[in-house]
Amino acid sequence: MSHRKFSAPRHGSLGFLPRKRSSRHRGKVKSFPKDDSSKPVHLTAFLGYKAGMTHIVREVDRPGSKVNKKEVVEAVTIVETPPMVIVGIVGYVETPRGLRTFKTIFAEHISDECKRRFYKNWHKSKKKAFTKYCKKWQDADGKKQLERDFSSMKKYCQVIRVIAHTQMRLLPLRQKKAHLMEVQVNGGTVAEKLDWARERLEQQVPVSQVFGQDEMIDVIGVTKGKGYKGVTSRWHTKKLPRKTHRGLRKVACIGAWHPARVAFSVARAGQKGYHHRTEINKKIYKIGQGYLIKDGKLIKNNASTDYDLSDKSINPLGGFVHYGEVTNDFVMLKGCVVGTKKRVLTLRKSLLVQTKRRALEKIDLKFIDTTSKFGHGRFQTVEEKKAFMGPLKKDRIAKEEGA
């Protein structure tokens, strides 16, 4: 510490080294929850897309606390989660060196958005992926082989996972290539898992079948990229005094003369952001239903509550900034999550047994804010804005042109 007579803790954690750009854009599940055969068969993870943030008002249910039975305002994140399609089954056997893939079976029909994932350039390709494989499901020899594969998986496998992909055409994004991932199937016996997965081949699985209201989940994703940053921004080291020669936002001493190299633990400039991160214990405040047609009418009121009966959708006025409108099922999570808008996020069931009172608290939303997130929004719905503003000039011009 040079001539200082006191020490200080180091700046920045060494637990996240190396701080470099993530090799994958989609968050990777490095461990799934522990299997419990006494529970019914269920999936353990799901993919969603970050739409944006808003705030809610709710009444706290925490007896003995100072805020019990009082209203609190909390920030929430909206993650759009259209149903995922199951297109494959993978069986694993446990070996002394860990899990090993035993067999992989794909469905007969696979959509183009999923096939795009197997090509670097879909436009220039011959688009022949799985054409030979899908014939297995049609001829007699192929069917016999598939039956043998299923029976051998029941006999030898200990872990069953399904291959599922997202439906990009349902989202307000330009990307056409679906995100594909393996999701572990937990609960029941291996035979029950395999039967469950086989029944759902080529079927859609909604998020409501994976997660429940008030559940604590983990969010895995890649953080927002910041580019190449200096040492003060990247490691939050202290700025040097004003009169320092050759810059202030630096580290004055980067180590001793010997060993004659800079240690890995010394804060240096470099990449900041776009790192792979897993955040645990995010509470689900609401699992919302997407737009649906009932009796020939489009039902959008997925942001109404027992206290706020106004007919409004979860979308703020003008849509979510840099995202658009959420028209599919969505998950409302407490607080913030990693990544930028439109970023794909992996939602995973918690690995822990939740015992804390905050984790088990029942959430009853009183109000969901839907004002415009582009500036200082004042109105919750379009009708409220029209009632306050009165007839606008553009309305009068349109009326005159119509007449």
Curated annotation (Swiss-Prot):
Cross-link Glycyl lysine isopeptide (Lys-Gly) (interchain with G-Cter in SUMO1) per UniProt, renumbered positions: K294
PTM-bearing positions, type N6-acetyllysine: K136, K286, K294, K366, K373
First-listed, main subcellular location of the protein, grouped into a coarse class: nucleus
Tele-methylhistidine found at: H245
A GO cellular component annotation in the UniProt record: nucleolus
Record field: compositional bias (Basic residues): 18-31
Glycyl lysine isopeptide (Lys-Gly) (interchain with G-Cter in SUMO2) cross-link, renumbered residues: K39, K224, K226, K286, K366, K386, K393, K399
Residue spans crossing the bilayer: none
Stretches the record annotates as Disordered: 1-38
Classification via Pfam families: Ribosomal_L3 (PF00297)
Keywords from the named record: Acetylation, Cytoplasm, Isopeptide bond, Methylation, Nucleus, Phosphoprotein, Ribonucleoprotein, Ribosomal protein, Ubl conjugation
Post-translational modification remark: Constitutively monomethylated at His-245 by METTL18. Methylation at His-245 regulates translation elongation by slowing ribosome traversal on tyrosine codons: slower elongation provides enough time for proper folding of synthesized proteins and prevents cellular aggregation of tyrosine-rich proteins It is not required for incorporation of RPL3 into ribosomes.
GO annotation (BP), single: translation
Gene3D superfamilies: 3.30.1430.10, Ribosomal protein L3, domain 3, Translation factors
Modified residues (Phosphoserine): S13, S304
The family this protein is said to belong to: Belongs to the universal ribosomal protein uL3 family.
Assembly information from the UniProt record: Component of the large ribosomal subunit. Interacts with DHX33.
Described purpose of this protein according to its UniProt entry: Component of the large ribosomal subunit. The ribosome is a large ribonucleoprotein complex responsible for the synthesis of proteins in the cell.
Protein name per the record: Large ribosomal subunit protein uL3
